[in-house]
C-alpha cells in the first residue's frame, strides 16, 4: 500500500540512507549530504528520536517476548475462547454455505444484536443504522476518509490512540490534542483550542480511555455536546471498552441520539482480537455513505467472522463471561496499582475497570529509553511517547493490568529505579 511504501521510505530517511526533498521525492543520500554517509567507518550518529510507527509494528511482530505489560489486548485465557470454538463447530457442522460474499452492511443477525444492545443503553437505532467492520480500526478509517478533508483541524484525545493520529495525518488533517484529565477533558484548554482553531471533528474515547483509562463524567459529556453545537464540529465516540465497564452510564451517542455523534464499538477486546469484528452506528444518510465507502475500499467484511461473533454473543454464558472479566480486571487493577504505588509511581487515575493504568516514576524520566532497555530483557512496555499527539520525552507508561503481574517485570522496574536514583545522586 501507499502507506507501507511511505513508511519504508521514512525509515530509510531516519537511518540516513535517503534524503527527502519537498515537492521532489526521496533520493539516495550522497556522501556530501550532511557529512558522511552511513556505513563502516562513519562517525556514530545521534540516537534517532522515538519512532512510534516502528514501535507499533514491533508490538505486533515480536511475539516471542515473554512479557507484554504494554500491549493492548487480553491474555488468551481471559477471553471467551470456548465459546469461539463452539461457534466455529456449529457453523462448520450445520451452518449455511459461506463460499460467497457477505452483505454490504454485514451479517443482519449480528447487526440486530448490536442494535438491541445499544437500545439497552438508551441509544435508539435499528439494524439499518449499524455497519459491521473489520474491527474498530476500519470503522475509524472509514469515518475519517468520509468526513476529514485535507487541511481540516481535527481534535483528538491527548494522550490517545496512535494509529488514529497516523490515520488522520495520512488523510491530510491538522491533528490537535485535547488534554485528558481523570474526569474527562481539560475543558479550559479545550475552549482555548476552539477559540484558536475551527475544528471539523473531535475523535474521542470518553469511557475507559486508552492509555489513561480515565472516564469522562456526565457533566463533561454534556459540556462537550454543548461546545460541539456552538462551534459546529462533529463527534466520533470510540467506545470499544464499553463491555468492560461494570457501571451503566450514558454515552455521548445516547445523550445526542446520533445527531452530531458517530458511535464506534468492537467485540475484539472481549472475544478475540483475531476475529476483527467492529461496528459503526450513525444517522442513516451518513451510514449509507460509509457502506458505499466500505464497498469501494474493500468490498464486504467477512461473514464467517461475523457469524462466529454472533454465535459467541448469543451464547447463554456471554453475560456471565463479561461479569467475570470485569471482576478479574478490577482485581488486577487493585493488585498492579498497589505494586506501582509501593515502588513510588504516580498513578494518573485509579479506575478499577478497563485494561490500563497510566503511571510515571520520578526516577524514570524517559519511558522510550526505558522501553528499549526492557525489550532487551524480554519485556514489551508501553512508552508514553507512543500515545502523545506531539511525541516528546515523557516518563508516562501504559500498563496493561492483565499482563503486569510477572515478578520479572517488577524486578526490572526496581533495578531501573535504583539505577536512576544512583545517577541522580
Where are the regions a protein language model picked out?
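Conserved core of the PLP fold type I
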Residues: 91-231, 243-258, 418-424
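Conserved glycine-rich beta-strand-loop-beta hairpin in the small C-terminal domain of fold type I
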Residues: 327-337, 347-360
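Hydrophobic residues in well-ordered beta-strands that form the structural core
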Residues: 156, 177, 235-237, 309, ...
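Conserved PLP-binding active-site segment of the aspartate aminotransferase-like
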Residues: 1, 282, 358-364, 381-419
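Conserved core segment of the aminotransferase class I/II
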Residues: 84, 257-327
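Residue-level detector of anion-binding/catalytic polar loops
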Residues: 153, 174, 234, 346, ...
Amino acid at each position: 500500500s501507499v502507506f507501507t511504501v511511505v513508511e519504508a521510505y521514512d525509515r530509510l530517511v531516519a537511518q540516513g540512507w535517503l534524503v527527502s526533498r519537498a515537492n521532489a521525492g526521496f533520493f539516495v543520500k550522497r556522501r556530501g549530504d550532511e557529512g558522511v554517509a552511513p556505513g563502516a567507518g562513519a562517525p556514530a550518529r545521534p540516537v534517532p528520536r522515538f519512532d512510534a510507527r516502528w514501535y507499533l509494528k514491533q508490538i505486533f511482530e515480536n511475539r516471542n517476548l515473554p512479557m507484554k505489560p504494554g500491549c493492548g489486548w487480553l491474555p488468551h485465557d481471559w477471553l471467551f475462547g470456548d465459546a469461539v470454538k463452539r461457534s466455529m463447530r456449529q457453523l462448520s457442522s450445520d451452518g449455511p454455505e459461506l463460499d460467497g460474499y457477505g452483505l454490504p452492511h454485514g451479517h443482519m443477525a449480528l447487526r440486530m444484536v448490536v442494535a438491541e444492545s445499544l437500545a439497552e443503553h438508551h441509544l435508539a437505532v435499528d439494524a439499518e443504522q449499524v455497519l459491521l467492520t473489520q474491527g474498530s480500526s476500519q470503522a475509524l478509517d472509514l469515518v475519517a476518509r468520509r468526513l476529514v478533508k485535507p487541511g481540516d483541524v481535527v481534535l483528538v484525545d491527548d494522550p490517545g490512540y496512535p494509529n488514529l493520529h497516523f490515520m488522520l495525518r495520512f488523510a491530510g488533517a491538522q491533528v490537535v490534542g485535547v488534554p485528558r484529565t481523570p474526569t474527562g477533558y481539560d475543558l479550559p484548554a479545550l475552549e482555548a483550542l476552539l477559540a484558536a482553531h475551527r475544528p471539523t471533528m473531535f475523535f474521542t474515547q470518553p469511557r475507559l480511555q486508552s492509555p489513561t483509562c480515565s472516564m469522562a463524567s456526565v457533566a463533561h459529556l454534556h459540556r462537550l455536546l454543548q461546545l460541539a453545537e456552538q462551534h459546529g464540529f462533529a463527534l466520533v465516540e470510540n467506545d470499544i471498552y464499553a463491555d468492560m465497564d461494570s457501571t451503566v452510564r450514558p454515552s455521548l451517542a445516547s445523550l445526542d441520539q446520533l445527531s452530531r455523534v458517530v458511535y464506534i464499538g468492537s467485540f475484539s477486546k472481549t472475544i478475540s482480537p483475531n476475529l476483527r469484528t467492529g461496528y459503526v452506528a450513525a444517522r442513516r444518510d451518513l451510514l449509507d455513505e460509509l457502506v458505499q465507502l466500505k464497498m469501494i475500499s474493500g468490498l464486504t467484511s467477512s461473514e464467517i467472522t461475523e457469524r462466529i461473533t454472533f454465535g459467541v454473543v448469543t451464547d447463554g454464558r456471554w453475560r456471565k463471561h463479561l461479569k467475570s472479566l470485569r471482576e478479574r480486571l478490577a482485581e488486577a487493577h487493585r493488585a498492579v496499582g498497589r505494586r506501582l504505588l509501593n515502588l513510588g509511581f504516580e498513578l494518573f487515575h485509579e479506575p478499577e475497570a478497563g485494561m490500563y493504568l497510566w503511571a510515571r516514576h520520578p526516577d524514570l524520566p524517559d519511558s522510550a529509553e526505558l522501553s528499549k532497555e526492557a525489550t532487551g530483557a524480554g519485556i514489551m512496555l508501553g512508552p508514553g511517547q507512543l500515545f502523545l499527539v506531539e511525541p516528546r520525552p515523557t516518563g508516562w507508561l501504559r500498563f496493561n493490568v492483565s499482563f503486569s503481574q510477572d515478578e520479572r517485570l517488577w524486578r526490572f522496574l526496581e533495578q531501573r529505579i535504583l539505577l536512576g536514583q544512583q545517577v541522580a545522586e
